[in-house]
């Protein structure tokens, strides 16, 4: 015996709604397989007739599944076969039909128990599948699944901007976890409480570590240790590439990246790379505009503590860097280094355009503006531009009328120091 494909589905607990109209046509009986002695041609002809007649015959109750199915609709007009105008269900040959399953509420009869169960939901108003998003109720699982797709399509998807915000929030959270100690003054974070305590001295200007040689004070003892090597001329860390000496290993490692070109620290805002983490931190203040270092004398603010240190020497007159050849003193070590090249004749900074060499990098930068024509210093009064800041400062005296260069012999004042220097020899003649 060979069972019809729709009959085998009746044994499972869920009814495929697509099969309901098909089952309503009565195609649920078992179809006999051809016997070995049956002529294939006669079997094909008789089988077609038998299948046609089955559309009007009832299935035996014991052959049907007694399982209650979840959802159904009311009686469908599709149950009427072959144009029965009187609404009676039957085959083309008007075979008698037995209705084994009758509704107690309205008396309608059905060939299949599953159709009766589905029909009874019309009277009981039993609810089926309820949507958890909008509360709408469906009797059929197919309608319910189709309805669910509308909510899935309507759900907003995260856009690129939200994804970037999520990434930024995740980075901030990771930074808070990695550096739990935060400065209340500027928001800078630290891994250890000792680092925060050391940083707070920047805001309080506390410098508890004093140099016994010159009296200079420092916030951190390691800075004092480095400074003391200036007095002893001790620089135990030498670069193998250029033989330059350094006070500590960190300065040497940072310097060696100049030769290797390795810049491991990148700025998230502009992508610029740096050799050290301190250089990156100072650079990021350009984007944030933070200037946490203030001068106690004039109130001027700086992004770097080193800039404040150099600036304060203007007020104190301190010049801790003295030349060993002529005794001339300087406020900055870089100025002393450039000055020492006067005695040695060294000019390591050469122009790539004309080959002219200079003692310091700042002189080379100023010289390059001759070739590029760049004049970054512009007068806010008349708009005239200059290659050097000193040229702009001299020009501004024209608008202000200030004459600061006074001759000590005769009291005559000049706009430029060079003019005063030319004038002074006249008193010796």
UniProtKB/Swiss-Prot annotation:
Residue numbers bearing the Phosphoserine modification: 76
Similarity section: Belongs to the krueppel C2H2-type zinc-finger protein family.
Localization per Swiss-Prot or TrEMBL: Nucleus
UniProt name for this protein: Zinc finger protein 275
UniProt keyword list: DNA-binding, Metal-binding, Nucleus, Phosphoprotein, Repeat, Repressor, Transcription, Transcription regulation, Zinc, Zinc-finger
PANTHER family membership: C2H2-TYPE DOMAIN-CONTAINING PROTEIN, ZNF44 PROTEIN
Ranges of biased composition (kind: Basic and acidic residues): 79-89, 167-176
Chain intervals for the UniProt region annotation (Disordered): 31-95, 149-176
Gene Ontology molecular function, alphabetical: DNA-binding transcription factor activity, RNA polymerase II-specific; RNA polymerase II cis-regulatory region sequence-specific DNA binding; zinc ion binding
GO BP terms, alphabetized: regulation of transcription by RNA polymerase II
Stretches assigned to coiled coil: none
Main subcellular location: nucleus
Database matches in InterPro entries: Znf_C2H2-type (IPR050758), Znf_C2H2_sf (IPR036236), Znf_C2H2_type (IPR013087)
Reported function: May be involved in transcriptional regulation.
Renumbered zinc finger spans (C2H2-type): 101-123, 129-151, 181-203, 209-231, 237-259, 265-287, 293-315, 321-343, 349-371, 377-399, 405-427
Biased composition (Polar residues): 34-51
Any one cellular-component term (Gene Ontology): nucleus
Top-rank taxon: Eukaryota
């Amino acid at each position: 015996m060979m069972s019809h494909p729709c009959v085998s589905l009746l044994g499972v607990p869920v009814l495929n709604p697509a099969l309901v109209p098909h089952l309503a046509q009565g195609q649920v009986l078992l179809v006999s397989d051809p016997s070995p002695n049956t002529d294939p041609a006669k079997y094909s002809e008789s089988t077609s007739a038998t299948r046609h007649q089955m559309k009007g015959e009832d299935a035996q109750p014991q052959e049907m599944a007694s399982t209650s199915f979840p959802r159904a609709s009311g009686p469908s007009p599709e149950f009427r076969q072959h144009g029965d105008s009187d609404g009676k269900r039957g085959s083309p040959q008007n075979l008698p039909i037995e209705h084994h399953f009758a509704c107690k509420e309205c008396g309608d009869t059905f060939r299949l128990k599953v159709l009766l169960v589905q029909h009874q939901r019309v009277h009981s108003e039993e609810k089926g599948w309820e949507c958890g998003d909008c509360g709408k109720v469906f009797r059929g699982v197919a309608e319910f699944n189709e309805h669910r797709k509308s909510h899935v399509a309507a759900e907003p998807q995260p856009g690129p901007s939200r994804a970037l915000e999520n990434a930024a929030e995740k980075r901030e959270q990771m930074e808070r976890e990695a550096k739990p100690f935060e400065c209340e003054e500027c928001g800078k974070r630290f891994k250890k409480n000792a680092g925060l305590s050391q940083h707070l001295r920047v805001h309080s200007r506390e410098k508890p570590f004093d140099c016994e040689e010159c009296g200079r004070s420092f916030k951190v003892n390691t800075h004092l240790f480095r400074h003391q090597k200036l007095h002893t001329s001790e620089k135990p860390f030498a670069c193998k590439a250029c033989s330059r000496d350094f006070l500590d290993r960190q300065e040497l490692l940072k310097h060696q990246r100049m030769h290797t070109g390795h810049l491991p620290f990148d700025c998230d805002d502009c992508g610029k790379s740096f050799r050290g983490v301190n250089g990156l931190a100072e650079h990021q203040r350009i984007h944030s505009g933070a200037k946490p270092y203030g001068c106690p004398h004039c109130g001027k603010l700086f992004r770097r503590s080193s800039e404040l240190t150099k600036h304060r020497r203007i007020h104190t007159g301190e010049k801790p860097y003295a030349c060993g050849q002529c005794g001339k003193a300087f406020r900055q070590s870089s100025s002393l280094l450039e000055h020492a090249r006067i005695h040695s004749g060294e000019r390591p900074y050469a122009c790539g355009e004309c080959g002219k060499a200079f003692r310091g990098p700042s002189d080379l930068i100023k010289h390059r503006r001759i070739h590029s024509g760049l004049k970054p210093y512009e007068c806010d009064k008349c708009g005239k531009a200059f290659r050097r800041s000193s040229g702009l400062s001299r020009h501004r005296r024209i608008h202000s009328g200030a004459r600061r260069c006074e001759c000590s012999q005769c009291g005559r004042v000049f706009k430029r120091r060079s003019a005063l220097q030319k004038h002074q020899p006249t008193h010796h003649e």
